[in-house]
A protein has these predicted regions:
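N-terminal small-domain helix-loop-helix segment of the aminotransferase-like
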Residues: 1-58, 65
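PLP-dependent aminotransferase-like
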Residues: 8, 12, 49, 68-119
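Hydrophobic alpha-helical packing elements
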Residues: 31, 62, 109-112
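Sequence-pattern detector for short linear motifs
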Residues: 35, 63, 115-117
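A conditional alpha-helix N-cap/helix-loop micro-motif detector
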Residues: 56-60, 106-109
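Short, hydrophobic alpha-helical packing/hinge segments within bilobed ligand-binding/sensory domains
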Residues: 62-63, 87
Length: 119
């Protein structure tokens, strides 16, 4: 078992109401500043860490946030099928209609994609 002082500290922190939940939805400010500085050094791109940089808990959250940012209710979004659920559901939650593109092995996917974009 862990030492008693470790268990006591864990219980103390767990009892605090502000110790539960996720970080701020934009992410930790210092991390956002570091990301903006990296893009400046690496790519020569200036980003405002307060309005142009976010930190997500993973790619699914990032895709859902992207869908909310770029989709208006009624938009039609093309999504491969099969795919991970978030590829469609993030856009569905944002009010989009999903047009599935069958993603079978072989070179036909891009032709099916071109056809789907016509409608």
């Amino acid at each position: 078992p862990p030492p008693a002082h470790v268990v006591a500290k864990l219980a103390e922190v767990a009892a605090k109401p502000d110790a539960h939940g996720y970080s701020a939805s934009k992410g930790i400010p210092g991390l956002r500043k570091a990301q903006a500085a990296y893009y400046q050094r690496r790519f020569g791109v200036e980003l405002d860490p307060e309005s142009e940089v976010i930190v997500t808990l993973g790619s699914k959250e990032g895709l859902a946030n992207l869908a909310q940012a770029i989709t208006a209710p009624g938009d039609v979004v093309l999504a491969p099928n099969p795919s991970y659920p978030i590829h469609s559901f993030g856009f569905i939650i944002a009010g989009a209609a999903i047009r599935s593109i069958p993603a079978a092995p072989g070179p036909d996917f891009f032709e099916r994609l071109r056809l789907a974009m016509r409608y």
